[in-house]
């Protein structure tokens, strides 16, 4: 008997009303059962007060963000003089062994976790642009997860796969994503060794890096088909938006994915149970 769990997670909850509406409708009309909220998001209060009460069984995560928007604390190594985050991913890697940088990062992460815990009970942690995958930052996040009793931290082990769609695969963006995927897999090999020390759960596989900004029902289905084995947890990250004024972009496509009944049937047919972090 197989025990394959699949989690569809909406990142960037609280970043805008478009993201918030997508979580609500994806939960009510689709198979979205998990979302990660940005504590510094412009629509954080709306997400907490208007969306979460309508999604009683939604698994809520903390989407740690030191990449975009304003900080909750004074952390000058992470922000400009106006308090806006101003480090890219490479800068984060280069600074990640700097003691003061890690101290300021910890202070900001604590503020973000505590803001979410003040109004909800988060059960997982991930981050904006996978910044927590950088090994020194990952170790910090595991320590905080244990302290704040958050049992699950995302890792980034995505199997390299390609869909039969030249518009997606034969592109510069896909090539860049492959490089990003290889870097994240390298980090994950190191990071997973820390998990037993902190008693943290994680996913076995991730879908959503190779086709960042290109996710749809086809890319998710092919990603699941590339995964073999039983007793596994597979997480797929999406960035869905339910626009007030219609747009056709990858955010809208990912919103559509979360409500695709044929895709939902395919997930079951492939032997996966649709779950969320709180039910692991």
Residue ranges and their predicted role:
Residues 130-134:
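Gly/Ser/Thr-rich loops at beta-strand to alpha-helix junctions
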Residues 1-7, 17-59, 63-120, 124, ...:
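Terminal accessory/targeting
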């Amino acid at each position: 008997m197989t025990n394959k769990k699949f989690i569809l997670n909406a990142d960037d909850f609280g970043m805008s009303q478009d993201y918030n509406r997508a979580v609500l409708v994806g939960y009510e009309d689709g198979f979205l059962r998990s979302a990660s909220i940005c504590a510094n998001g412009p629509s954080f209060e709306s997400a907490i007060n208007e969306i979460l009460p309508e999604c009683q069984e939604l698994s809520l995560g903390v989407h740690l963000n030191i990449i975009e928007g304003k900080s909750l604390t004074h952390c000058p190594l992470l922000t400009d003089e106006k308090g806006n985050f101003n480090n890219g991913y490479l800068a984060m890697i280069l600074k990640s062994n700097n003691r003061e940088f890690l101290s300021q990062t910890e202070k900001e992460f604590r503020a973000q976790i505590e803001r979410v815990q003040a109004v909800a009970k988060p059960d997982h942690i991930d981050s904006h642009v996978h910044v927590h995958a950088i090994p020194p930052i990952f170790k910090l996040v595991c320590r905080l997860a244990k302290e704040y009793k958050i049992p699950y931290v995302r890792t980034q082990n995505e199997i390299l796969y390609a869909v039969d769609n030249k518009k997606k695969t034969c592109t510069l963006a896909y090539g860049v994503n492959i490089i990003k995927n290889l870097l994240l897999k390298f980090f994950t090999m190191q990071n997973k060794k820390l998990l037993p020390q902190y008693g943290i759960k994680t996913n076995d596989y991730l879908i959503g890096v190779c086709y960042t900004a290109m996710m749809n029902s086809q890319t998710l289905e092919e990603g699941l088909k590339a995964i073999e084995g039983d007793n596994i947890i597979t997480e797929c990250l999406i960035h869905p938006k339910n626009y007030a004024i219609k747009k056709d972009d990858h955010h809208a496509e990912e919103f559509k994915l979360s409500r695709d009944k044929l895709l939902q049937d395919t997930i079951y047919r492939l032997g996966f149970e649709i779950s969320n972090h709180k039910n692991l």
